[in-house]
């Protein structure tokens, strides 16, 4: 029996990896590639691509897009890959590959990077460099926590009812205690932007009023404004025939709940429940011509 269980787990893991969507695969490959590039001694990859507040200028703005791919060592890279992969593949399956490309090489990386630089340089007066995909991890944890809050607002511990959207905050402080060398403010910047991108778009008017005292920046719901126009994405997909050319590509018509993470209503049939739908994450099914 144990060998069969081991074989089953291995098969499921292999199937999961083979079904990862395109952008998620590219991110993983890039992280591994930058780690391999850092093994040579000619160019200091960490110094070249890390997010260093005092090194930022017009000529070094590229750091805002390179720092998530660069890691201190193989352990750092592997841990971030394991944490990031399930979160990124869910996001890509819902929003689409082109959306992920535009958002993660744009506002979902640069906004938390600017926020971190502002805090580190102008508030604390420090120059602590950060690198690694953990900022993305906390950003996506914020996104997932808010979506979970919509379905299950609270969980109970003893006699205390705790809002589910606060779970990543607990993870944030636990990480700061367990890994003191990690960047608390870098993680916090990602988490704030993750909350801000989803909170407003997943709450109804009554819930928005109830949460007005805690949502802060989250009320912006800026994903609707930062995501590329759907007409442009459809035009690019059709013009370049991305569905026909790129395996594991996730198109606009392939996403689970629609463009901005609209969750099913209470009247949605059981077959369309969140648990069932997430089982399709990473599917390579192609729709259209």
UniProtKB/Swiss-Prot annotation:
Any GO BP: proteolysis
The keyword Hydrolase belongs to this UniProt entry's keyword annotation: yes
Pfam families the record matches: Rhomboid
The keyword Electron transport is annotated on this UniProt entry: no
Main subcellular location of this protein, as a coarse class: Golgi
Taxonomy, superkingdom: Eukaryota
A cellular component term, taken from the record's GO annotations: Golgi membrane
Enzyme class: hydrolase
Family designation: Belongs to the peptidase S54 family.
Stated name of the protein: Rhomboid-type serine protease 2
């Amino acid at each position: 029996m144990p060998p069969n269980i081991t074989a089953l787990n291995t098969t499921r893991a292999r199937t999961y990896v083979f079904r990862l969507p395109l952008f998620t695969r590219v991110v993983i490959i890039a992280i591994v590639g930058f780690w391999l590039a850092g093994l040579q001694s000619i160019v200091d990859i960490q110094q070249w691509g890390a997010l260093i507040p005092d090194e930022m200028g017009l000529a070094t703005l590229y750091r805002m897009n390179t720092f998530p791919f660069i890691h201190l060592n193989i352990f750092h890279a592997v841990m971030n890959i394991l944490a990031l992969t399930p979160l990124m593949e869910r996001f890509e399956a819902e929003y689409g590959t082109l959306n992920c490309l535009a958002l993660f090489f744009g506002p979902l990386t640069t906004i938390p990077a600017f926020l971190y630089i502002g805090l580190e340089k102008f508030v604390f007066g420090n120059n602590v460099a950060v690198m690694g995909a953990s900022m993305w991890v906390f950003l996506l944890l914020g996104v997932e926590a808010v979506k979970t809050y919509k379905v299950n607002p609270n969980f109970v511990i003893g006699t205390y009812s705790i809002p589910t959207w606060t779970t990543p905050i607990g993870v944030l402080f636990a990480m700061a205690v367990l890994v003191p060398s990690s960047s608390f403010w870098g993680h916090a910047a990602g988490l704030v932007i993750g909350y801000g991108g989803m909170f407003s778009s997943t709450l109804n008017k009554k819930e928005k009023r109830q949460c007005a005292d805690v949502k802060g920046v989250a009320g912006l719901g800026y994903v609707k404004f930062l995501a590329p126009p759907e007409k442009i994405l459809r035009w690019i997909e059709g013009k370049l025939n991305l569905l026909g050319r790129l395996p594991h590509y996730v198109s606009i018509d392939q996403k689970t709940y629609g463009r901005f993470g609209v969750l099913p209503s209470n009247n949605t049939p059981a077959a369309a429940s969140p648990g069932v739908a997430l089982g399709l994450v990473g599917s390579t099914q192609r729709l259209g011509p």
